[in-house]
Curated annotation (Swiss-Prot):
Catalytic activity of the protein: S-adenosyl-L-methionine + H(+) = S-adenosyl 3-(methylsulfanyl)propylamine + CO2
Designated name of the protein: S-adenosylmethionine decarboxylase proenzyme
Taxon lineage: Bacteria, Pseudomonadati, Thermomicrobiota, Thermomicrobia, Thermomicrobiales
Pathway named in the protein's UniProt entry: Amine and polyamine biosynthesis; S-adenosylmethioninamine biosynthesis; S-adenosylmethioninamine from S-adenosyl-L-methionine: step 1/1
Coiled-coil residue windows: none
Entry keyword Zinc: no
Cited PANTHER family: S-ADENOSYLMETHIONINE DECARBOXYLASE PROENZYME
GO BP, one annotated term: spermidine biosynthetic process
Family: Belongs to the prokaryotic AdoMetDC family. Type 1 subfamily.
Catalytic residues identified in the record: 62 (schiff-base intermediate with substrate), 67 (proton acceptor), 82 (proton donor)
Enzyme category, top tier: lyase
EC number: 4.1.1.50
Positions of the record's site feature: Cleavage (non-hydrolytic): 61-62
Amino acid sequence: MKSLGRHVIVELWGCQNIDSLQAVEEAIRDAVAATNATLRDLQVFPWEPYNGVSGIAILSESHLSIHTWPELGYAAVDVFTCGEHTNPEAAIPVLRERFRPQRMEVMQVSRGMIVD
């Protein structure tokens, strides 16, 4: 069987720099570059009263999103890419370097399974 895309879900706990719009935006840009995806649009928004940040990159190949809860030290990340030339797992070292989590959980889902 073949899949149309791969979806990597990353749970980050005990993070640093997740209350900064600039840090989240830079992490998204670097993660997109690492996956070899094509950035089409990027939006980053602050959330009050906890200084959380949400950012989403629209990719030619799908999307990458980050949502943060600084009061909990937690960030939720989705990296969904389609196409043989992309590697969503390549975002993981970027996230680790940028946010320095104490704990990280990674789940992978194959999307759009096609029977050959």
